[in-house]
A protein has these predicted regions:
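Short, charged/polar "capping" segments at the starts of alpha-helices
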Residues: 14, 108-110
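Helical anchoring/docking segments at protein termini
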Residues: 14, 58, 80-81, 100-101
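Conserved TIR/SEFIR loop-to-helix hotspot centered on a Trp-containing motif
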Residues: 65-92
Length: 118
């Protein structure tokens, strides 16, 4: 069974929950902080474990304006994940684990993407 971790900002919360439920209905094992991370647990360790876990075959990056801003400014949980994910992406010539999902575009139709994905 495929296993995915979803990286997102809370601004896409509803979209993420709908996507997670759809993936589960198609037999995908979904790891989501909202479901897995318990109060008091180290969120940075959780994110690092998810990104580096060999059983997690894909990391879906839900890209909207807020996610891109937080990633580029290294703020909040998104900023923490960016530090981990960008190292993985830059460290490998060919990578297929990290998949950006475009959740929002600007008024000109441009995708909101963090700098490390562009």
């Amino acid at each position: 069974m495929p296993k995915v971790f979803i990286s997102y900002s809370w601004s896409s919360d509803r979209l993420v929950l709908e996507l997670a439920q759809r993936l589960i209905s198609h037999g995908v094992d979904v790891v989501l902080d909202k479901w897995e991370l318990k109060e008091g647990q180290d969120k940075y360790a959780f994110m690092e474990r998810c990104v580096n876990d060999p059983d997690i075959t894909k990391v879906l990056i839900i890209c909207d304006r807020v996610y891109a801003q937080k990633a580029n400014n290294r703020t909040g949980g998104v900023g923490d994940e960016t530090v981990i994910i960008s190292g993985e992406i830059y460290g490998k010539m060919k990578q297929e684990k990290f998949i950006p999902i475009i959740a929002e575009r600007d008024d000109e139709g441009n995708e909101y993407l963090p700098a490390y994905i562009k």
